[in-house]
Amino acid sequence: MFYVIGGITVSVVAFFFTIKFLFELAARVVSFLQNEDRERRGDRTIYDYVRGNYLDPRSCKVSWDWKDPYEVGHSMAFRVHLFYKNGQPFPAHRPVGLRVHISHVELAVEIPVTQEVLQEPNSNVVKVAFTVRKAGRYEITVKLGGLNVAYSPYYKIFQPGMVVPSKTKIVCHFSTLVLTCGQPHTLQIVPRDEYDNPTNNSMSLRDEHNYTLSIHELGPQEEESTGVSFEKSVTSNRQTFQVFLRLTLHSRGCFHACISYQNQPINNGEFDIIVLSEDEKNIVERNVSTSGVSIYFEAYLYNATNCSSTPWHLPPMHMTSSQRRPSTAVDEEDEDSPSECHTPEKVKKPKKVYCYVSPKQFSVKEFYLKIIPWRLYTFRVCPGTKFSYLGPDPVHKLLTLVVDDGIQPPVELSCKERNILAATFIRSLHKNIGGSETFQDKVNFFQRELRQVHMKRPHSKVTLKVSRHALLESSLKATRNFSISDWSKNFEVVFQDEEALDWGGPRREWFELICKALFDTTNQLFTRFSDNNQALVHPNPNRPAHLRLKMYEFAGRLVGKCLYESSLGGAYKQLVRARFTRSFLAQIIGLRMHYKYFETDDPEFYKSKVCFILNNDMSEMELVFAEEKYNKSGQLDKVVELMTGGAQTPVTNANKIFYLNLLAQYRLASQVKEEVEHFLKGLNELVPENLLAIFDENELELLMCGTGDISVSDFKAHAVVVGGSWHFREKVMRWFWTVVSSLTQEELARLLQFTTGSSQLPPGGFAALCPSFQIIAAPTHSTLPTAHTCFNQLCLPTYDSYEEVHRMLQLAISEGCEGFGML
């Protein structure tokens, strides 16, 4: 009986296995017959299907080289294991139609990948490498011949990296806070990683003790300074990626604070604090809420030419009425001998004055015979006007305040109500700039106010008929009689002899072409300080006679038009296609010239003369306060004195900084004074100068010209690859472009800086680089890349893997821009 039951069981099992085999065989035959794609079927026969001797996506596997979750910024890899249907390894070197697609789920950003077939004994494995910069959830789709590999698509989460102090910021940052004694104030901090991801996975939010706050009082000498009494508590919110620092000070006065993360200052973590009593706070609030009325404070004025507390060491830049800059009523005081700037002693008897603070300006006045007001100094209420807080003055023992706007000499005042005066100014400033000093908040305020300025002017269409062959001349003629209201309208551009209707395309093209016509150096309205076509452009003091000053007014109006159009948003957004010198941008917002502008505007002059003077002893050099000017043939034309009697005043170690600043004033500003004045005249017709004044020169460039995003496709289209073996051209270059495609804009700018010496492209992009961007096959292996910036050459060694290319390129561009040798 036992044998009978066993035989029946074996028969049943054999029957089921036979049925399973027949069903599988039938399925393979049907699959073969239904598959009409000859490319997918290849040379396979029905016998291959019967044996399972074909690549089956569902039999393939994917293995991951990392454990979840993982941080962004690393070179990641996974492996696709290819198998026949019958479970045998499938040789990966055969064409299999493997397609890998990786994208950020929320941002819909595609990630470039590289594929590499491994050698024996893993010849059935394809290694896929990639790098992600943005934290979040990613979808990874792996397909073979259009069919998903088993369990594809996959979903992986990449976490933010560790906190980087230089990327971490205070939300709604102010350079000076006005607080009330004993009342808490909360600062919101957003921790960010190296790639600007808000981070919540590190100890930045788990251990609040990483955030430290140091505060010291401004004014007293170190030996007189006492400890500042304050309370600090730190909490966090993992959902909003924020840290909250709650601060309470218990003593009145002016202080300087610094917030650090792991003993490293965060991005905007340094600021001043004015602490008022409850009564003082009420006075300040009443002062600020009183619109249209100047609040005055009694003070004492010390020697205005005492420049010991400022690094500028430069007399004031004389401004014209068209620029409407702050000026003094007593010109004789502004033109004191420069040597007085080096006299640190105060005058024996300070002058009694009155300081008036209004929503728009801060002025210092003196009263003759106690009834006749005489304005001595006027400063704008804007971020460019800086306050420094010192201790009691030696005469009246009143707290001292130094006011410096970068235009006039610093003014030193002592005042019984110094803290109330400063707090009134700061609160008025905060109202003027929209309540925050962060760049984006200032941009939003600027655009909102600019729209308000032109609100009553209609944005209806006005036709602009121009000739493509004489664009500048025809554009000048078409706008010759335009009023400010006309410039505020929506331009409908019509090119002569062309039938295209302007739905936005011709208008954008006109802006592009007219910017090139005005700011391209070939037209000689603007120039460069060197022959490098990547150099910044500056008004041309030696322009041809036919280029009248009216053209600078037109250029100013065009820039103002672009700013106004951008404030409207959407399709109206229009950037200025130019790269201006820092010194020219500084003059637009009324800043004084400084020798450090040479470093960006005229690098060759900075390296050859400025650095030489800074780094050498001047006692043996026969250098005077004068500049020799040569004509085009190289002959001495004239000698220009940088100050009265400059030709007889030697440059010494003590006054060489003063000399360099005067040299900057002459070369960068005085020579183009008329050009800048006319440019500002046109610009300020459309954009009030008080709105521009809320930005510094770097922010102004971003506002006008944008970030200048670097296009990887443009890079790849115009880069020239020179030399190299098959391995270099087919593998290393493929890895290189994958790495480049994964870089952030900041990293791309560093790569451009590393190779060309400039972090920005000319307006024409990579196509305009001269010489072209070249990638040279270096005769080395596994070393750091090097660069020849004079020739725009990147020397790239050979590497063994994508990970090695990624690591070496990252190391090169992060360490600096001087080029690197072998490790």
UniProtKB/Swiss-Prot annotation:
Some GO term, biological process aspect, for this entry: which one?
ubiquitin-dependent protein catabolic process
Q: What class of enzyme is it?
A: transferase
Mutagenesis or variant effect for residue 790 to A: Failure to form ubiquitin thioester complex
Q: Would you name any one GO CC term?
A: cytoplasm
Which segments constitute the HECT domain? 483-823
Q: Which PROSITE patterns match?
A: FILAMIN_REPEAT, HECT
Stored SUPFAM superfamilies: E set domains (SSF81296), Hect, E3 ligase catalytic domain (SSF56204)
Q: Where are the Filamin repeats?
A: 52-158
Cited SMART domains:
HECTc
**Which positions carry the signal peptide feature in this UniProt record?**
none
| UniProt GO molecular function | ubiquitin protein ligase activity; ubiquitin-protein transferase activity
Protein name per its UniProtKB record: Apoptosis-resistant E3 ubiquitin protein ligase 1
Which species does this protein come from? Homo sapiens
Query: Gene encoding this polypeptide?
Result: AREL1
